[in-house]
């Protein structure tokens, strides 16, 4: 643990806090909290040994010490001193024969690094790279960490651009797009909360590692700020699931009911999307504070407490899956009613299905009911890969389907381009032929007619 942490170790610790939407069960992959607890116990044992062991027989020797990494006995002058790799390391079982080395000089002083007051030591046999397993769990977790970081970054960028587009064009302001904007906001907040959590843990871990302040790791995990960051992430994730549910319910109401009071129903949707998650995230935080107030709330000693959050999210996933099935049935019936050939029906059905999966979060059903405490080994990796990869890129797919390839958005861009082109052409004509005035009445009437037609179209499609 001396020095800055390697990428594998950091990815492992970050993923220990991710899972699907929350803490991992006790007994799953090693966490930062567990590692520092083991380090504390190792330090206690070392300090007891340093106090109780008898002094050496000679007067000249290198003093026994604990250097925040390993426990060193008294050293004989002019010799190498070695101790086994510290057992608190998460990968200690993979380097059972490894040792860390120091050199005791003839003067009875520990050899120091060049141009430094720190003692020299060789811990190459205890490093992660010496474990020999190219497909180790930590390397798999590093791969997942890279995947979900790239996914959230792309999703965040695409969603910000898509939100600006929907807000920038006045003709796109309608109930349907307001719902889309709230869904975009939930994805943006989810990505931001993950970035904040990762950045906080990375900064805290790296700083403590460089300064050998391992107690600072645990004190941060025990701090209010760490728990608030994690509580915020839980709320953002829950709100994201419930805005996906709102999208599904709204889609179904459009298909099932012909007349809707959109102003009233939009207020209801806002209450569901942003309000309902508070009803179970806040109680979960209170229960954790009262009965399981340890670490950064990333561990679940009692999985019943985690069900306070998990069950409402499973409910949202289940309802959206039922809506997905119902919508597919409606699409099939309408395609058959149009007397299309079987090939066209299959193609259109496949297109509709693939489009609805990211929009409703249907992929969540695959592992929705596989609880974290039951996932081990390969199943756990597949579960993590499916959830983290699909969820992180889902915002990007939603932005593409709801905005970038949307016909109304493309029409607005074409209209804006034509308007700019006509205005630019008009300015060029005015500057080159000032005596001649171009009549604008026809252009104005044409533009007005086009705008009215599009407004009516948008209102019809948004109703």
Curated annotation (Swiss-Prot):
> Impact of mutating residue 128 to Q?
No effect on stimulation of cAMP accumulation in response to GLP-1
CDD domains for the chain? 7tmB1_GLP1R
Q: Does the keyword Cell membrane apply?
A: yes
GO CC terms for this protein?
Answer: membrane; plasma membrane
PROSITE patterns reported for this sequence: G_PROTEIN_RECEP_F2_1, G_PROTEIN_RECEP_F2_2, G_PROTEIN_RECEP_F2_3, G_PROTEIN_RECEP_F2_4
Question: Annotated site (Interaction with the endogenous ligand GLP-1), which positions?
Answer: 121, 128
Its domain of life?
A: Eukaryota
Family according to the record: Belongs to the G-protein coupled receptor 2 family.
The record's function comment reads: G-protein coupled receptor for glucagon-like peptide 1 (GLP-1). Ligand binding triggers activation of a signaling cascade that leads to the activation of adenylyl cyclase and increased intracellular cAMP levels. Plays a role in regulating insulin secretion in response to GLP-1.
This protein is called what?
Glucagon-like peptide 1 receptor
**Species of provenance:** Homo sapiens (Human)
């Amino acid at each position: 643990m001396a020095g800055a942490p390697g990428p594998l170790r950091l990815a492992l610790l970050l993923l220990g806090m991710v899972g699907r939407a929350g803490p991992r069960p006790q007994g799953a992959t090693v966490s930062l909290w567990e590692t520092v607890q083991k380090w504390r116990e190792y330090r206690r044992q070392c300090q007891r040994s340093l106090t109780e062991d008898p002094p050496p027989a000679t007067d000249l020797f290198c003093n026994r010490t604990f250097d925040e990494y390993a426990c060193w006995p008294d050293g004989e002058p002019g010799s190498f001193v070695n101790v086994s790799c510290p057992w608190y390391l998460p990968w200690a079982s993979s380097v059972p024969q490894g040792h860390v080395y120091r050199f005791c000089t003839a003067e009875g002083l520990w050899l120091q690094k060049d141009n430094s007051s720190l003692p020299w030591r060789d811990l190459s046999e205890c490093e992660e790279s010496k474990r020999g397993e190219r497909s180790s769990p930590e390397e798999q977790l590093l791969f997942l960490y890279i995947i979900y970081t790239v996914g959230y970054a792309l999703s965040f960028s695409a969603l910000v651009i898509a939100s600006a587009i929907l807000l920038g064009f006045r003709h796109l302001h309608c109930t349907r797009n307001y719902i889309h904007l709230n869904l975009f906001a939930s994805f943006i907040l989810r990505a931001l909360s993950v970035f904040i959590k990762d950045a906080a843990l990375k900064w805290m871990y790296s700083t403590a590692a460089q300064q050998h302040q391992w107690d600072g790791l645990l004190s941060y995990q025990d701090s209010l700020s760490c728990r608030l960051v994690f509580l915020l992430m839980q709320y953002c994730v829950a709100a994201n699931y419930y805005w996906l549910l709102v999208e599904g319910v709204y889609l179904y109401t459009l298909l099932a009911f012909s007349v809707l009071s959109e102003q009233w129903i939009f207020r209801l949707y806002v209450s569901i999307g942003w309000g309902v998650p508070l009803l179970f995230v806040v109680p979960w935080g209170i229960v954790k504070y009262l009965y399981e107030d340890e670490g950064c709330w990333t561990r679940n000693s009692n999985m019943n407490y985690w069900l306070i959050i998990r069950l409402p999210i499973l409910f949202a996933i289940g309802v959206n899956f039922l809506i997905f099935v119902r919508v597919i049935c409606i699409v099939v019936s309408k395609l058959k009613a149009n007397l299309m050939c079987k090939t066209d029906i299959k193609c259109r059905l496949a297109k509709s299905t693939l489009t609805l999966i990211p929009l409703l979060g249907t992929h969540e059903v695959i592992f929705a009911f596989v609880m974290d405490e039951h996932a081990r080994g390969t199943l756990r990796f597949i579960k993590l890969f499916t959830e983290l990869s699909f969820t992180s890129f889902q915002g990007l797919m939603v932005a593409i389907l709801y905005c970038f390839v949307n016909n109304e958005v493309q029409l607005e861009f074409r209209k804006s381009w034509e308007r700019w082109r006509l205005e630019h052409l008009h300015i060029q004509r005015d500057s080159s032929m000032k005596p001649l005035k171009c009549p604008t009445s026809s252009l104005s009437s044409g533009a007005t007619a086009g705008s009215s037609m599009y407004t009516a179209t948008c209102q019809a499609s948004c109703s």
